[in-house]
Structure formats: structure tokens, C-alpha cells
Amino acid sequence: MAVIFVLFFLVSMALSARIRPSFNGTALSGTSNKHPFEPGPNTIFREEVPPSAAASGFPSAHGTELRTHDPSIIKVGSIYYSYSVGPSITIHQAFSLDGPWTEVGALLSGESVIKKGDRKAPWAANTIYINGRYYCYYSVSNSGCRDSAIGVASSAFPGPGEWTDHGLIIQSGTGEGSDVFPLNQSNTIDPNVFVDGDGTAYLNFGSFWTGLWQVPLEEELVTVKGLQDGTLDAVHLAAEPGKVWRSKLANSKAKTVSTSKTGSPICGDPTGGHPIEGGFMAYHAPYYYMWFSWGRCCEFKDPAMRSNGKEYRIRVGRSTSARGPFVDKQGIDLVDGGGETVYGSNGDVFAPGGQGILTDEFGDILYYHYLNSSVSYDFADARLGYNRLEYVDGWPVAVY
């Protein structure tokens, strides 16, 4: 029987905001970015992006049957745990990344205690283990808006049933602290916590708008350091300054657009689509790596939305400090639009993103969600995939 491979070529237009119900450690000190975000002299404005999947050179994915978005995976003993969007944050477990994966319950006992956004099914969980306890950082928001918040729950066990929801640690758009820089111009979703070798913990977050940011956490890991006393030490990690697609608000004649105290729109960005999100920091000596998803994450039923070359792909920058600056191979700062593409669409792999890094006895693993183009472009059909990483001259390369 002949097997027909349908090649999808990249070139057109997409939406200006992420549409989804979902997700997603050692350092020196750096300096804070205290200025509003503006394109700099080294800013890259991308008119077109990467070659067709056929010419990508990316390896095939280790595909699985676990349907997920923005997974967070940890390994405890011989068991893998995956935390992802779903009622009260869904937990799956398996004895192999390849599966089979079994749903074992929910992380929270009900809705998030944060009274914002989609409380019933928080997005982008990021689970870590430190000091004998598991911490799961999560987001609540609404699609296309930055009226968002990040919360945290903790437990002595990785499975369901024993978690305490500590609630809000940081928010943007509306609410206490949302008028503090850079929360007054960013989107507090897609949390990722990186713990330094000296025990210092950093919260990385951000989606669209002004990109990815970092703030330090207190030692107890459930409070942002300096937020209450005006000494917040925020660092700008990465951004997409170029208008990758036109905003729906650009020609809007609507008389009212919800804005923050600084005038920054809360729902929709009239400056256009700046598709960068899903930051994940990892360390592989001697560098710190800032991974992120670039492009459109979801809703590809319309062929025009999947043929324009602006779908998700996984990019990275590196630094000698967890506080940056992070640069790509050309030395371009991620804040100026830099970023090295490590994995993207190829074969039946479409729009990989929402990534994380897992380290086992054999090395580093890049895991992510993706759409299998031979099966479906439906949002609900996104599934877990992964690839091993090799490092060439200090730069990660995806291999099968």
C-alpha cells in the first residue's frame, strides 16, 4: 500500500492572541530592566520565518498518545508525572515517556482560589521538587487577555489528593500589584521556576505583549521578593518586538477598549501580534538556557492558519547567568528578537511548543506538545512528543 506524505508549506496570517485553555534551574546576579519596552537598535523585524518543513532538517518526534497542552513533566523514582490543563490541573503518570499514560486524578481539590480567569481549569502548570516538597505553579487567565495571575500549590507527594493551594503570587491587568513595572505591561501566565545552585529561586513568566520576564522568589517559594515593598528586581528575558501579524484592534472602531492604569490594553494588543511565550529555563554546564515558544500555538482547522509559516516552534538563547542577558548564535539578545530555532514543524509534526527540559541518566530531553498532521489539526488532539538533545559548541541540537 502506498503511503502518501502530505507536505505543508509555510507562508500567511494568524490571530493576534493565544487561544487555548492551557501550559507549561544556577546563577550569577544581573541588572534589572527598569524601562518600558521599546524596539532597540538591534531589534529584528521578521517579515518571513523559517523554511518549509521538508527542508527543516529536524528529526522525527517520539510521539505519544497522551493528549496534552503545555505539559510539565517530572520523574519520581521510576514514575513519570505529567501536569497539564484540565479540570483542577490534570495529572497523568507512566513508567516511560512513551507511555502508556494513565490519568490518576486532579492536583487541586476544586477551582483555584484565585478569583480570575479560568479558575476551573488552570493553564500551564510547572511542577518542581525542592526541599522535600513539590510546588506546582499555574496560571489563570482568559484567551487573548492579560488580566491574568499566577498561583502556586504545594504537596509532600507528586500525585493527586495532598495539595495545598496557596493562591496568588503575582498578577497583571487588574488587582493589587498589577500596576507595578513590569506587571503593568506584561501577561502573567506560563510560569516557570528555576532554582539556582545557591538556592535562589526565580519565577520566569510572560506571553505576547512585551514578552518574557523574571522576578526572584522568597525562600519559601510562594511569594515574589520585593513586590510589596517596591524593590521588585525584574529582568527582561526575551521579546518579539516585530509585528508578526496584524492586530484585530488595529482598525477597530470600538469606543471602549479595556486598559490598565498605564493605558496598556488588557484584552488585545493594538500594536500587533508578538508571539513569544512558554519560557522555560534550564542549566547545562557551563550555560543557562532560556527556552521559549515562538509563533501561533493553536486553532489550525483553517488551512490558511497552518500554511503561513507562523506556527509554533521552539527557540532558545543562552547566557552565563540565570539573569541573562540571553543571546542566540549570532549574539543577538533575545529581548531584541533573537532566538535559535531548535525544533519546528517536520513530517507529520506540526507546531511543536509549550516545551520543557527533563534530565535523566542519559542526558537532557526536550519535551513539548504538537499536532500530528496525519491525524488532526484539532486543538484537542495536541499530544506529547519528545526528543533527546545533544550539545554542539554549547548549543542544543534535537536528535531522535
Curated annotation (Swiss-Prot):
- Localization of this protein: Secreted
Pathway(s) the chain acts in: Glycan metabolism; L-arabinan degradation
Database matches in InterPro entries: GH43_arabinanases, Glyco_hydro_43, Glyco_hydro_43_endo_a_Ara-ase, Glyco_hydro_beta-prop_sf
Catalysed transformations (reactions): Endohydrolysis of (1->5)-alpha-arabinofuranosidic linkages in (1->5)-arabinans
Which sites does the entry annotate for glycosylation? 24, 184, 372
GO MF annotations in UniProt: arabinan endo-1,5-alpha-L-arabinosidase activity
Pfam families to which the protein is assigned, alphabetical: Glyco_hydro_43
Q: Principal place where this protein is found?
A: secreted
Signal peptide residues are 1-16
EC number in record? 3.2.1.99
User: Do the record's keywords include Nucleotidyltransferase?
Assistant: no
State the active site. 70 (proton acceptor), 277 (proton donor)
Q: Name one GO biological process term.
A: arabinan catabolic process
State a GO cellular component annotated for this protein: extracellular region
**Feature type site, description Important for catalytic activity, responsible for pKa modulation of the active site Glu and correct orientation of both the proton donor and substrate:** 190
Keywords noted in UniProt: Carbohydrate metabolism, Glycoprotein, Glycosidase, Hydrolase, Polysaccharide degradation, Secreted, Signal, Xylan degradation
What CDD domains does its record include?
A: GH43_AnAbnA-like
Its annotated function is as follows:
Endo-1,5-alpha-L-arabinanase involved in degradation of pectin. Its preferred substrate is linear 1,5-alpha-L-arabinan.
Annotated family: Belongs to the glycosyl hydrolase 43 family.
The protein, known as: Arabinan endo-1,5-alpha-L-arabinosidase B
**Provenance organism:** Emericella nidulans (strain FGSC A4 / ATCC 38163 / CBS 112.46 / NRRL 194 / M139) (Aspergillus nidulans)
State the encoding gene. abnB
